[in-house]
Amino acid sequence: MKLQNLKVPLTLFAALVLAQAGASSALAQSNSDGFETVINSPPDSFSFGNNTIGSNTQVNVLDGVVFSSFTIGAADGTDTNIELNVFDGAVVGGTLFANTGSVVNVLGGNVGAENTGGDLRASGGTINISDGSQIFHRLNASDGGEINISGGTVFRLNLIGDATVNVTGGTVTSDRSSSSVNAVLNVSEGELLGTFSFFNGTVNLTGGRGQVFFARAANIFGGVVSDAIFASEGRIAGGRQQSVGFTSDVVLSGGEFLLNGEPVTGTVTLGSLNSFYNPFFREESPDVLTGTFADGTPFVFSSVNDSLENVTLETVTLPSNDTSPLNIGPGEVSTGGRTGQTLTVQPGGLIDESFSAVDTILNVRGGTVADGLKLARSVLTVEAGSVVGAGTSSYGSDVNVSGGQVGPNLEVFSGTLRLSGGRIGRGLTIDPEATATIVGGEFRLNGVPITEPDVSLGANDALEGTLADGTPFVFSSSAGDRLETVTLEQVSLPDASTTPIIVDESTVNIPLGLRPGQTLTVEDGGQLGDDFTAFDTTFNVRGGQVSQTTEIYRSTVNVSGGQFGAITSFIDSLSEVPILVRDNSTLNVLAGEVGVVEIDSGSIANVTGGSTGRFVIGSGGEVNIEGGRTGTIQLFDDTVLNIFGGSFGQLFLSSADDSSVNFTGTEFFLDGDLIDDLEVGETRLLDASLTLFTLSGVLSDGSEFSSPINRRFTDNLQISITRVDSISEPVLLGDVDLNGSVNFSDISPFILVLVSGAFQAEADCDENGVVNFLDISPFIAILSSL
């Protein structure tokens, strides 16, 4: 069914879309009495290899694995009444072609199982996917085929011709684009991941959730588009869309249309698909279109995130607007705030994703707001215990945060932000026409105390301090924040406790950050949330988990266990938000797992053990690797990398001007040739004319390495090698008198190191990078074990 006639009455049109999405073949096995031949495998034997299942045949794959490829129905469409059923427990590893006259029901089984290959293709036939099913390789639809997905998981959906896909449940990931005019995707339930491109086809949404859609025609009556949808024709009458790109043949059906707060009719244009809005390089404020769709869902579109080019506004009768105050409690979900409404989100309550609030009061008092909140001429209040997701956009609204957590990428345009507590994630944008007030104390600009009420922030400035509730904060361009002028309101702060803080599985009141002089240790079962910030502190990670959005300033972090940051694959790590280690901080990695780390401005990372996903070394940063496993390392200008041992990944050096990479080991090879004239104790700079080569050898701890070096595009990048005569011996914990054994003669030297405040690796019995009272118990345990 091709949905092009935009003049059909709205209610009838929506009904037709729903009917089409529900018109699929029954997602169940047919009665075997309707077939001349019925094959149940097992127990029946059937040779699947390269065979064609002909007319009036039902094949039931009940259990086991079938690796062969086969065709269901003749390629010319002359066969009829054919059915293949793949039941739970069955795995079909080959490629299946469902031609005209055939039906394939995947009833909990697997097709194209992992590492077996094989696609499932509806070439004029019908394929039904139900709960529990998994389609690992491509699920293709072409040549008039139909695919109905009511459950299960489809990893690679691919429309390659004139076909229809109906999604009423399950999870579907896109694989390829379709250029067919007659390709149709109908979604009423389920989740669609990735980008679905139907440049000449049609997308009809009445429910469910999708991420990105490109289509010639889009007809939306419900559901959620969490990222973006682009179309050149269609009708938008409901649902929620995070970002849109619509042109002149698209109709917005609803009412209460306002452009920049003024009534608007006819057609409207704002934003451009070909432009990027930057609040600091513009001549006028962003345009904002608000309204309510025909289903009663409010919307907010702006020239910041959306593009509308001569889109038609169609006014219809809207559902009544109840302005009675609404409390959203446990288990309750709200999907939009219309003019004059007051919504209060209590603990357990939820504001759903891509929620739009227009002329609304929204109080979050312990509840949760999902990603993509959009505010227009509204008031948002966030109190302690609340969570607001990422990507909140505020236009002409007042945002008051006194507690809780607001996710990254909060944008405030031509409104106000008042921050007195809680925490806000990275990427805060305050439009020059908006005002921001921070209530608290201990304010510093680039580490220097300030008392002036108004502060202007340059491109490289960092503003830090403590909010009125005692939570430390920092805003800087290097963390993605964009602020020009901020008003600071000084108030008395709660005292910062100097008692060491332990966070484990039993901890209830977990701090949102650390103030100067505080010490925190994360033990097994402990967990620190997003956007944790620490200034002038000691921060120990012995177990548990710490978020990757942690920021460290003028502090020492010792990781001897647990997980510090997100642990991902190399490809995923490229898009991960890094841990920030800055302003003369020290990161010691002795054990445990560490994610992506960005280190700069006089800070040093020492890696002697554990696993570190990736280092990004910024200006003034230094990384020393003596052991453990380190992933890729990217160097920028004015940086130092010293490698003594352990293993490490690829070095990215193209931006490493005025930097140095230094290797220490027992022997070195240049492009496979031994450097045999390097004396023990000698340090040699490799000739600057060597721009593309491989350096290999044995590091000082005995680890072998081979590292391609490319410095063709750098200026003054020095590569040095230092030869030592023997492999370094591992540290013997507890052997403080360095006699090669641990016994009671080590007690007095241990006490001397402890009281002096000095560092000796043998006395660091808890391996957290410092010697203090925390080493007493493990030292006693070592002695007791003798």
Walk through the language-model features, giving the residues of each.
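Cationic, beta-structured binding surfaces that engage anionic biopolymers and membranes
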Residues: 184, 398
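Bacterial N-terminal signal peptides
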Residues: 11-21
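Sec/Tat signal peptide C-region and signal peptidase I cleavage site
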Residues: 22-28
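Extracellular beta-strand scaffolds
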Residues: 44-47, 59, 65-68, 77, ...
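Cellulosome-associated attachment modules in secreted, modular CAZymes
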Residues: 29-32, 38-39, 43-47, 54-59, ...
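Extracellular beta-strand-rich solenoid/capping regions of secreted or surface-exposed proteins
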Residues: 50-54, 69-80, 96-101, 120-122, ...
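Bacterial N-terminal signal peptides that target proteins for export
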Residues: 2-12
